[in-house]
């Protein structure tokens, strides 16, 4: 057990150093997934030995460690393959090489520079969904990688590799899911593309393959992702504010004013805002809420417990908002303090990795 604990400590320490470094070097991200793979192997072995905890860390079930190990192997292999191409010289972030981004449509492709597309169903401003068009999509073609751009037309969002289109968002299916009239309007920057009557009357005429199937490229009225400016990092799947437009019965392209796609990044360091707040409840507990990728938060929590335990009161496990209306999909760790002075001392001493965002606040709940 002691040998596994030492190896796990060293592995997680290296992971946290990579998170703090926040490198854009692809070699560092290959190393990151090697460490993730090693961590999964150690936890799997610990569970086989009958261990439920290693220090303060809970040992997950065998299936969990096995699945994470397989994911790490998959990511390591694809990144090592990408490392052999000219795209290895481009800057790459941890988020762009994460497993979550790898599984984001279009799946099993690397993606960069996403831009919001808002689709309004049934002509109703309150019935809209947001999707993402990626400026750069890295597709594996036999033994190499090809960089292409995704585009939008009345049928969906797609990218073209060679002479074939791959649709990874099918507006026909989305309209069946979220609407009742099979009509939709695509709002992309200052452009609106409306569903044609032929599309709304029958789905057979625009049968769109899944993202793993290719169809010959056709002439349409696409909108390139490279013409837009408002970028987001991950595809939001929440209800969004609609854009007022007149209904369309045929394929059309209209120009409207700029569309506010919204800033999906979390605001950090709201210290001044909370300082001005009237905290009349003397029993309110000062807190800091950390948000980021689950494994990064786990390693950060381990370091806090190991080296900075005197600078805070309590620390939570990693948790997520369960509501479908949650503003983000980040993992969260909450830390409580005896006083605002202790919290400020914590912030002055502890180095927070740039991949972790934090907010200050108060918790009125009486803690046991």
Swiss-Prot record:
The keyword Iron does not apply. Residues 284-368 are annotated as: DNA-binding domain. One of its GO terms (biological process) is DNA-templated transcription. It holds the Pfam family PPV_E2_N. It comes from Human papillomavirus type 6a. Keywords: Activator, DNA replication, DNA-binding, Early protein, Host nucleus, Phosphoprotein, Repressor, Transcription, Transcription regulation. Transmembrane segments: none annotated. This is Regulatory protein E2. It is found in: Host nucleus. The lineage of its organism: Viruses, Monodnaviria, Shotokuvirae, Cossaviricota, Papovaviricetes.
